[in-house]
């Protein structure tokens, strides 16, 4: 079995196959005419970035292949990854022809504190692979854009260093462990460093066998995340057919155990069903975080956007709902808000900005999304975030 694993890991991935096919075409006689720009290479400047999508080609050009693939890909066949983006096409914006949009405000109050925008930076791991200063650089860029950042439990730097890098608002994301003391130690360190909220991830009960084999090449070249605690031996090497014990651990009683130690809001991240949303509230969560992990956990899961309305109905206004997965534009943000989210988080887009241009790139991406949100609000006749409701959209989910 170990030999089969090694052979499988060495085989071409989907993206490698595409690259090989492109190389074959390039060598074809059909493409034998000399390219006058063959040796010309130019990376666009930051001031040329108009949409978030503009950052991805620059990111692709700058990063090693393994690092880019780790960030870009989804679980297994990537159905969920594709569905996340497709779901925004199932929601139309309803224009409002006559409306006074001369003054538009995007500030929102969340858990008693006011944010200038409903857009936050989602937790994402190992940003040191994208930029030498990793999460510290991300915090600088997010702070410059007046945007709250959620720091991943699997960050490349300690929470103390990340918090000291800038003065913006921070939350902390926790991957639960079986060792309760380890969970409590991590939460204490995060709150002592200045994190005012905690997001507990509940949607990584196992790791894709295919993805795990591909990602070992990346992980082997990076430092172990300093906030993650002790890492057990990877059980997938020895038991490829079972759930990896010792990695993540989820029981609802965990929320009961840690609630009293968290001074600010506590949210459960990775909720995709109304029943789980109700259980979040029953076990002391102050908010529900709707997410499918950006299509990186369960293949053939529903998109976050299509399940959002049902979860909103189940929650019935008792707690705020945070949303992520698939957001690339300001109109995407408005669609999620219209379907019931109080705020949204973006993951890949600020990572593109970080990899391409460092902190200024992060700031620019977030400012682009903010400008696009204001534009979409103007066209739909909404002058404040509170004015955005389901009448701003028309849905056609399959």
Regions found by a protein language model. Give the residues of each.
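Alpha/beta enzyme core
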Residues: 184-323, 334, 339-342, 348
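Short beta-strand segments
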Residues: 122-123, 173-175, 199-203, 347
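An N-cap/entry alpha-helix motif that binds or orients negatively charged groups
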Residues: 35-112, 210, 217-250, 386-388, ...
């Amino acid at each position: 079995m170990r030999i089969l694993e090694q052979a499988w890991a060495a085989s071409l991935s989907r993206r490698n196959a595409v690259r090989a096919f492109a190389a074959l075409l390039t060598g074809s006689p059909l493409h034998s005419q000399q390219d006058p720009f063959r040796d010309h290479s130019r990376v666009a400047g930051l001031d040329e970035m108009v949409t978030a999508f503009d950052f991805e080609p620059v990111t692709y050009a700058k990063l090693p292949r393994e690092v880019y693939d780790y960030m870009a890909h989804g679980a297994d066949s990537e159905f969920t990854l594709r569905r996340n983006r497709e779901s925004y096409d199932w929601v139309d914006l309803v224009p409002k022809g006559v409306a006074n949009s001369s003054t538009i405000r995007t500030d929102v109050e969340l858990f008693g504190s006011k944010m200038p925008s409903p857009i936050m930076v989602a937790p994402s791991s190992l940003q040191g692979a994208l930029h030498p200063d990793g999460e510290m650089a991300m915090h600088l860029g997010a702070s410059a854009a007046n945007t709250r950042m959620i720091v991943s439990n699997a960050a490349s730097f300690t929470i103390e260093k990340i918090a000291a890098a800038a003065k913006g608002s921070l939350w902390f994301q926790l991957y639960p462990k079986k060792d309760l003391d380890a969970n409590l130690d991590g939460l204490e360190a995060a709150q002592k460093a200045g994190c005012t909220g905690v997001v507990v991830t509940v949607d990584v009960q196992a790791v894709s066998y295919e993805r795990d084999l591909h990602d070992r090449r990346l992980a082997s070249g990076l430092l172990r995340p300093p906030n993650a605690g002790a890492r057990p031996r990877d059980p997938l090497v020895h038991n490829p057919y079972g759930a990896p014990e010792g990695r993540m651990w989820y029981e609802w009683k965990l929320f009961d155990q840690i609630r009293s130690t968290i001074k600010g809001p506590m949210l459960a991240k990775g909720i995709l069903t109304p029943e789980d949303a109700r259980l979040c509230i029953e076990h002391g969560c102050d908010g529900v975080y709707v997410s499918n992990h950006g299509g990186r956990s369960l293949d053939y899961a529903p998109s976050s956007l299509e399940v959002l309305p049902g979860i909103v109905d189940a929650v019935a206004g008792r707690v705020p709902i945070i949303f992520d997965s698939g957001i690339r534009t300001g109109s995407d943000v408005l669609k999620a808000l219209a379907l019931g989210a109080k705020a949204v988080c973006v993951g890949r887009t600020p990572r593109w900005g970080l990899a391409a241009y460092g902190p200024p790139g992060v700031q620019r991406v977030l400012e682009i999304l903010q400008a696009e949100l204001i534009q979409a609000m103007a066209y739909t006749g909404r002058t404040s975030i509170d004015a955005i409701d389901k009448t701003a959209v028309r849905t056609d989910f399959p």
